[in-house]
Amino acid sequence: MNVLSLKILSLGLLLMTLASCVSSPPENLANICEIFEDRRSWYKAAKKAERRWGIPTAVNMAFIYQESAFRAKAKPARNRFLWIFPGRRPSSAFGYAQALDGTWREYEKNSGNSRASRSSFSDAIDFVAWYNSNSTRMSNIERDNAMHLYFAYHEGNGGYQKGSYRDKRW
């Protein structure tokens, strides 16, 4: 075996190893108990976020389900140019929480989690709980009011306070 073949084989093994590290979504997205049975680390991260920010785990998990269907690398669909060609994405939303670039930077700065990754479940659920905790203070929403917390999450607290969610078909 020559050196080039060994390099190609090594690269292939490395890529296969890295691919196995990528988390696929849970099989039954509608059953939080099954999700947590399959992903014990997710349960621990969700409970840690609940303790830290005071937002119920069920609320935070519902947001991640709605935003990304538990896909680590989720992005908004691209707009189409001339009905065929893929264009730009409508926003910078990315990851489990579909957090925008600017909001994620604010989270990193204000939460003390400066090395957070939007494709990390534990970072994403902490982000969702952090954002919801801020919404309870800024927009006077109860911690267990998932519907109004989601309106504030989707529209931003400023949009929520202006009532922009009322004009949308949910």
Predicted ranges, named:
Residues 1-9:
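Bacterial N-terminal signal peptides that target proteins for export
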Residues 24-170:
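Catalytic glycan-binding domains that act on GlcNAc-containing polysaccharides
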